[in-house]
């Protein structure tokens, strides 16, 4: 059963950016999340939270994504560790807890130099910049928005650039 899930998760990660709704459908085929290994459960909640975020579902609680941050924080999986903290930040941002969101976003940056996913970095910097904007800390806001812009430029992602410039 374990290898079956790792294949499913890999597929889910591949199609996430284009088809997050399909990821939700895929994840719904897993019968009992409590029967999963610790790693598989962490992956499940990370993918679930990411797919819900990308399909604009409102987050109600950070207890599930917390399982992912607790697991990945103990690993060397830089990308998933960063993603778990980012999505935990997104969740508490939804819950209107800006200080905690900021804390989690900055935790997502702890291995910044090792992250090569520029689309992810662009979104992360943008989220940090937006929070600083709301707090009227404009110098830091501009710093992170510029970093966001640079990430999307590296991607040649015109959609991403227009998203930051609005």
Positions of predicted regions on the chain:
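A "functional boundary" signal
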Residues: 2-166
